[in-house]
Amino acid sequence: MSVRTVSGDVSAEVVYVNYGLIEDYAQLDSLGVSVKGKIVIARYGRSYRGIKAREAERHGAVALLMYSDPQDDGYVRGDVYPEGPMRPPAGVQRGSIFNGTGDPSTPGWPSVEGARRLADGDMPGVARIPVLGIGYGNAAELLRDIRGTAIPQAWQGGLPFRYHVGPGPVTARVMVRDDRATRGIKPIWNTVGIVQGSEYPDEIVLIGAHRDSWNAGAVDNISG
């Protein structure tokens, strides 16, 4: 799940871009591999996922798939859930790919009822290509058959076969539907509590955590 992605339906050859970082694309350039018009697949880790989306778009990719490689979070590092804490093959990391803070539709002004809002294509920091997280079980089905350019040794992950950069012969179709247009904008509420100090009543210690949640439960949001 990648929050702030756009809707899209694209089909293209797949290129493996390691972690999808600036230096990884520089390495691809040195190998003579272009991702323009391709679907790129990148490992999670070593940078914020929004940077991966930004760099994929900047280099001309039409979609980005991200997965947790078992070398970083999976059976290579220990027992997978439920026997252990590591990610199983179908486990998908969720999170935002927004490169910014606050409401991207109201950058620099309050996101209140009746506020002027930017259209999706005008929001700063929002990727304009479909971005989707997948499990390493699904990623293996793509990576196993990618051929083309040999990878630098440091790009080898933990799946039980030799990785290649591509492009081809593997193709994929990425379909993402963003239902914000049909669900609309909903209000959220903040909860504020004050414990007045006795020794330094005029000084403030501010402790906060986001109240909104990915789903049921309070582990992520209430814990900070």
Task: Report the location of each language-model feature.
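Extracellular/luminal Protease-associated
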Residues: M1-M123, P130, A216-S223
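Soluble metallo-hydrolase cores and metallopeptidase-like ectodomains found primarily
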Residues: M1-Q27, D103-N221
